[in-house]
Amino acid sequence: MAEKDYRLGWTEDEEYWRTNYSSRPYASTGKQDYTFYQPAYRYGFESAHRYEGRNWNDIESQLSRDWTTYEHRTKSTWEEIKGAVRDAWDRVTGKRPVGTR
């Protein structure tokens, strides 16, 4: 999918995460609401498309560095949102948790 086109798919994924984020291990404490994780899901979604064909383990350190300048970033740290970024990445790349999409 071309860069200008893949962002259109974010609406569908955002709805999925809005509905399902609270079932994920990093969100199960209930300390943060969806708005805390939403930028991380979007970042994972966009990054999976931007780095299509790359392996998460090969790109994670770059994603961590780039998170600090991501345009939709909140004040969250990489460690706080890494799980959400990875979930969104996995959903896009087909390495989804059971029961998704």
Regions inferred by a protein language model and the residue ranges of each:
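Intrinsically disordered, low-complexity, hydrophilic segments
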Residues: 1-101
